[in-house]
Amino acid sequence: MNDVVTYDLCKSVLRNIKKCLPSNISQYSVHEPNLSTKVKKELNKCLSSTHVSSSGKYIDKLSESLKNIIGSKYILLTNSGTSALFCAFNEIDITNQEVIVPSMTFVATPNSVIHAGGMPVFVDCSKSSLNIDKDDLEKYLIVNYKISNGKCKNKKTGRVLKCIVVVHAYGEAANINLICKLAKKYNLEVIEDAAGALGSVRSNKHVGTVSRMGIISFNGNKIITTGMGGALIFKYKKDYESVKHKISTARIQHNWKVEHDMVGYNLRMANINAALGYGQIIDFEKILNKKRELYQRYCDIFSNNKYCYIKKSDNSSNNNWVTNLFLKDEYLNNHQSLINYLQNHKIFVRELWKPMHLLPMFEKCRHSRIINAVKSWQTGISLPSSYYK
């Protein structure tokens, strides 16, 4: 690609991005927290109460707000989305068993599988989205696995395949219903990694509620942040009570005795973190609407662009946490030049997640033929997607 084309491409993308963003900001990150006066007010109330650790009214307030948004009776707050994932895998017990993980995900997903004693097996995303490709997954299962004594086993390794992780990538709701049907056919559990997808809905169900367990992240770059934090969504009360006990150091409830009945974890969210989240979630619908407006502006302005495009979602209502822009195939070689150009102009876009099967610590993990995830990584950039008033 010649320098004239590269320069014209970079200028075109920069110009269009700027048209979508407020002009009174000196630099733009992919996603920054929305810390309004309301948030500071709730934080001050929490500090005044002195309840800043693992108990306090803000844990209950944030939990109730999430129950109303998500439509689940059973939600636990954790100290990170990664902890929530670990707890889900620990609860279904994946020790020495394989777990299907999309290669297009954040590193916390396979890390949590390994920390819980499992072995990730990576599969591709679809051409039309960054989410797991159900048809590709089914073909991979047919070729590589068989049902033996009621368990799904790898034909080569003999190991049991226990679970499929469905990642709702960048906030876009995956077709979880189809994957759950496929999982049932192979006697597999399904865990939903909805880390960035709070507010995303498909088939009138909030992400994280269709499978046995789902997780949300409240990291600093999420649509609602608690600084660090996460949540576990449960379908069954039994799982909820089990995990609640384990993440609370397995302490036996008593007014004054301090006793424990198993080796537990301390993975709860602190009240002060919950206060930070509650101060934002009060305005959740307003935030969602602003995010969707920004996404639509991006879609409109890049709809007939010569160089790039935005993948549009089908049959789902998404929170538009992060909007991703993709170069057309013939301009793939301009990817790094474009990112560098935009960063030099104070628009701090990022690459997409590098596919997990390409990372050095996972290079020996089994995986399907992965084409779409690699192409998306090579052509995609995450645009400034913060909540702009």
Tell me what each language-model feature is:
Residues 52-98, 104, 112-114, 122-124, ...:
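Phosphate-binding glycine-rich loop
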Residues 117:
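Structured binding elements
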Residues 1-52, 383-384:
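N-terminal "arm"/small-domain region of PLP-dependent enzymes with the aminotransferase-like
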Residues 128-226, 233, 237-238:
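Active-site phosphate-binding strand-loop segment of PLP-dependent enzymes
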Residues 111-113, 182, 206, 272:
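Hydrophobic/aromatic ligand-binding patch that stacks against planar heteroaromatic rings
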Residues 60-64, 69-73, 135, 147-159, ...:
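PLP-dependent aminotransferase class I/II
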